[in-house]
Swiss-Prot record:
Organism: Halobacterium salinarum (strain ATCC 700922 / JCM 11081 / NRC-1) (Halobacterium halobium)
UniProt: Zn(2+) binding residues: C25, C28, C42, C45
Residue stretches of biased makeup (Basic and acidic residues): 1-14
Transmembrane region(s): none
SUPFAM superfamilies xrefs: Cyclin-like, Zinc beta-ribbon
Name listed for the protein in its UniProt record: Transcription initiation factor IIB 3
Length: 317
């Protein structure tokens, strides 16, 4: 037993010595050895200690992103926005062969039949059909709202969780899909109001709000209150206002928040009033109606919030 232990310790010492020698330059005995791409090089004298002759890159060359996409022979990465995560193939709808020539009538009919069967076998059961329809709805609404790809991914993940937890039972697929998209916008900090989401949805606002609260509670989603300042860049861009107005609007919101005026107020309405007040203070005047149309709030809301903000800034009414 003791002999085996001594032999093991001896092997460990020899291995450690070998590693130290591998990390040391044989030319100048420097330990300043780095790995640069496929080579181990001494930084002091420049000696190449070890190199890898295998090129792990592609055999083709590309000089811009379009050429790289055209020559690449791998598929797109997996995505949660498709019910099969993008792993299945699809038959093209262009009815052309590999050389770009149009197919004859017999071949076109054959390809149409193959497409139909392929669509049928892609969804094996009711759960997959449910998921396919819901994710297509999320993609449609996300495109209409102009939100980034990350929001679609998050919304798809939330819907998959809701489906797994059987939260869809007794509720419409459109309602849960819309609620998941709204929750994803909130989580990712992409300012979209419930009214804006309702405009692109196929259900009413009351059902969206009710389903959103249910899904958020059942899945324990961590969603922070919307910051009115998140709306400012979009409102200012639509109204063609300068960065000075945005900065002033941020100052107005911060001052109002310090005095507790944000509690119970609509974030979009508060942001719209701040933009209106800032445009007046910076001599880039916009009417209440123009701001209300962009922010999708009423002029009464802007007037009420504007009065509160001006008093908070100490300018009087």
């Amino acid at each position: 037993m003791e002999r085996a232990t001594r032999e093991r310790e001896k092997e460990q010492r020899e291995q450690a010595q070998t590693n130290d020698e591998a990390q040391q330059c044989p030319e100048c005995n420097s330990a300043n050895v780095i790995t640069d791409q496929s080579e181990r090089v001494c930084e002091d004298c420049g000696l190449v200690l070890e190199d890898d002759q295998i090129d792990h890159g592609p055999e083709w060359r590309a000089f811009n992103s379009s050429e790289r996409d055209q020559k690449s022979r791998v598929g797109a990465p997996t995505t949660k926005t498709m019910h099969d995560k993008g792993l299945t193939t699809q038959i093209d709808w262009k009815d052309k062969d590999a050389y770009g020539r149009s197919l004859d009538a017999k071949k076109r009919n054959q390809m149409n039949r193959l497409r139909k069967w392929q669509e049928r076998i892609r969804t094996k059961d009711a759960g997959e059909r449910n998921l396919q329809f819901a994710l297509s709805e999320i993609d449609r609404m996300a495109s209409a709202l102009g939100v980034p790809r990350s929001v679609r991914e998050v919304a798809s993940v939330i819907y998959r969780r809701a489906l797994k937890e059987d939260l869809i039972r007794g509720r419409s697929i459109e309602g849960v899909a819309t609620a998941c998209l709204y929750a994803a916008c909130r989580q990712e900090g992409i300012p979209r109001t419930l009214e804006e989401v309702t405009e692109v949805a196929r259900i009413d606002q009351k059902e969206i709000g009710r389903t959103y609260r249910y899904v958020a509670q059942e899945l324990s989603l961590e969603i922070q209150p919307t910051d009115p300042k998140e709306y400012l860049p979009r409102f200012a861009s639509d109204l063609e206002l300068s960065e000075e107005v945005i900065a002033k609007a941020r100052e107005i919101i911060d001052t109002s928040a310090e005095q507790g005026l944000l509690s119970g107020k609509s974030p979009s309405g508060f942001a719209a009033a701040a933009i209106y007040a800032a445009s007046l203070l910076c001599n880039e005047k916009k009417t209440q109606r123009e701001v209300a149309n962009v922010a999708n709030v009423t002029e009464v809301t802007i007037r009420n919030r504007y009065q509160e903000q001006i008093e908070a800034m100490g300018f009087g009414v």
